[in-house]
């Protein structure tokens, strides 16, 4: 056996060397195929970073980025000392943390349930139903939510009341999170469903023969098969804890629910585009990005500690 392994190693090294030599010889071809992606990344990801200088300047449209006077960390001090800072920050954190706690397990549960459906025809129909909401745009979804929860909407008719749910700050987070779960949970379960399809059938059969009940089969056979996918998805979602989209929150906002619906991204939109305070809004956006990076590194570190060194 050792002889076979020793013979295999040089072959593997030779194969790798051949690949490297081929790439070096045909580097123009690889560069040709990589160029569109590289250009798009540079133009839309890296070049706009020059605009971050606005966060440290008293930006003037006429003078431009290079001609505007430097103010240093003034905008950051102004934002952090603002009486509304903690309210906007907590609104943002509550939405994303509650969404993560309630929304993250749902795709996993859906995938586990889908894995239990034996008839292919029924399984495809169920998949179609749970995948469809993902293709509804955010604005259309918000319109549907407003119609459903209006004082004369279906929900109030069913309950026999005439409550305007969209004006209640206490109901905003539930509406936001529940509608998000309905829209994205089915589509998010695809990766888990694909991973479960590759789970060892022999192991499942052995567990059944050993007398394992349904919960034991899920805990000891199916969940370990998708553990790596769960870890990666959790890290990615936790890393975006401050990057909650402004479109949905803005579309569901009313004057009455602002105490709960005004988040950092809607605040940036209001002071940046509506009030024209570009430097201040850029500083708030940069604050968001820095917190995201810190949280991503921290969550990845925690997951590695809890998962035997496995993370991103």
Q: Over which residues does each language-model region extend?
A:
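Short, Lys/Arg-rich, polar N-terminal cytosolic tail immediately upstream
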Residues: 1-23
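A structural signal for multi-pass alpha-helical bundles of membrane permease subunits
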Residues: 22, 26-312
